[in-house]
């Protein structure tokens, strides 16, 4: 996403488009943008910044490539809406790792952070560490080993961008649904992710 911003600023549109098309291929293959294109990291995604790449490229590309990118964007959005939703209706970071991988991640965190998880559920700790990895905030104090419990503002803002972009540029028959989803997310973010003060 951020490399593409530089490529576009440097008028290397074709290079930026090829980056986005490569990601679109992976999204269509897996349903999401893998954390890395290696088998061991397919249990978690990247944050959904692909939509930013699409928005940045739309003014420069033809209809055929726009359709490919928007289709991948919609597929990734559907993944987040089916696999990473909290009871409040907002999205969260997570993973699909097995128990063994989660326990391994807890062990890895103990070594990296020089911290012992006494009497803790190692699988739960590992689950949340992998969720932090999905967020891009690997081994940081941001989520206090409870990442999968948070409706992260950045994540939900990125998905709001998906909803508004797909409403504007996606299939016309789905426009009303995406507008409603964006309005619902906006209301929930004000309700659950703010301190109640006027944010406008």
Task: Specify the residue positions occupied by each region the protein language model found.
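Catalytic cores of carbohydrate-active enzymes
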Residues: 77-98, 157-200
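Active-site acid/base region of carbohydrate-active enzymes
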Residues: 63-150, 195
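Substrate-binding groove/exosite segments of carbohydrate-active enzymes
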Residues: 1-51, 55, 151-153, 164
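C-terminal capping/lid segments that line or modulate ligand- or cofactor-binding pockets
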Residues: 44-64, 193-200
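Alpha-solenoid repeat scaffolds
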Residues: 29-30, 64, 87, 173
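Structural helix-adjacent loops and short alpha-helical linkers that scaffold large soluble proteins
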Residues: 8-20, 57-74, 167-186
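Mid-sequence acidic-hydrophobic segments that form the walls
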Residues: 26, 30, 53-60, 76-83
């Amino acid at each position: 996403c951020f490399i593409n911003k530089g490529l576009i600023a440097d008028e290397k549109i074709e290079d930026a488009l090829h980056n986005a098309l490569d990601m679109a291929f992976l999204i269509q293959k897996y349903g999401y943008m893998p954390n890395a294109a290696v088998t061991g990291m397919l249990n978690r995604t990247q944050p959904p910044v692909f939509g930013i790449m699409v928005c940045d490229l739309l003014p420069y590309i033809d209809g055929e490539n726009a359709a490919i990118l928007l289709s991948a964007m919609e597929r990734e959005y559907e993944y987040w809406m089916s696999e990473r939703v909290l009871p409040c209706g907002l999205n969260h970071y997570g993973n699909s790792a097995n128990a063994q991988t989660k326990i391994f991640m807890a062990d890895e965190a103990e070594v990296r952070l020089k911290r012992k998880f006494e009497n803790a559920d190692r699988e739960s700790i590992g689950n949340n560490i992998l969720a932090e990895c999905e967020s891009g905030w690997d081994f940081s104090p941001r989520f206090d080993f409870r990442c999968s419990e948070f409706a992260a503002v950045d994540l939900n803002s990125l998905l709001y961008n998906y909803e508004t972009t797909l409403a504007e540029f996606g299939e016309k028959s789905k426009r009303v649904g995406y507008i409603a989803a964006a309005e619902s997310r906006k209301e929930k973010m004000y309700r659950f992710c703010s301190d109640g003060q006027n944010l406008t």
